């Protein structure tokens, strides 16, 4: 009976920020933009949370990894 009383919320589809801005590439040197897609522990946010499309999520992941490699972003946050 309790199951019938619960109402399901319809999840709103998140729009890819990079597709909406028509930005051509994601720059690994733009640390402020990349920090939005990293958790407080230093993990990269998944697609279902960030709302990015698959193409831009792959580019974002590569940019974050490049930025970490040259020490613009930390691997872990303390």
From Swiss-Prot:
<keyword id="KW-0699">rRNA-binding</keyword>
<dbReference type="GO" id="GO:0003735">
    <property type="term" value="F:structural constituent of ribosome"/>
</dbReference>
<dbReference type="GO" id="GO:0070181">
    <property type="term" value="F:small ribosomal subunit rRNA binding"/>
</dbReference>
<comment type="function">
    <text>Binds as a heterodimer with protein bS6 to the central domain of the 16S rRNA, where it helps stabilize the platform of the 30S subunit.</text>
</comment>
<dbReference type="GO" id="GO:0022627">
    <property type="term" value="C:cytosolic small ribosomal subunit"/>
</dbReference>
<comment type="subunit">
    <text>Part of the 30S ribosomal subunit. Forms a tight heterodimer with protein bS6.</text>
</comment>
<protein>
    <recommendedName>
        <fullName>Small ribosomal subunit protein bS18</fullName>
    </recommendedName>
</protein>
<keyword id="KW-0694">RNA-binding</keyword>
<dbReference type="Pfam" id="PF01084">
    <property type="entry name" value="Ribosomal_S18"/>
</dbReference>
<dbReference type="InterPro" id="IPR018275">
    <property type="entry name" value="Ribosomal_bS18_CS"/>
</dbReference>
<dbReference type="GO" id="GO:0006412">
    <property type="term" value="P:translation"/>
</dbReference>
<comment type="similarity">
    <text>Belongs to the bacterial ribosomal protein bS18 family.</text>
</comment>
<dbReference type="InterPro" id="IPR036870">
    <property type="entry name" value="Ribosomal_bS18_sf"/>
</dbReference>
<keyword id="KW-0689">Ribosomal protein</keyword>
<dbReference type="InterPro" id="IPR001648">
    <property type="entry name" value="Ribosomal_bS18"/>
</dbReference>
<keyword id="KW-0687">Ribonucleoprotein</keyword>
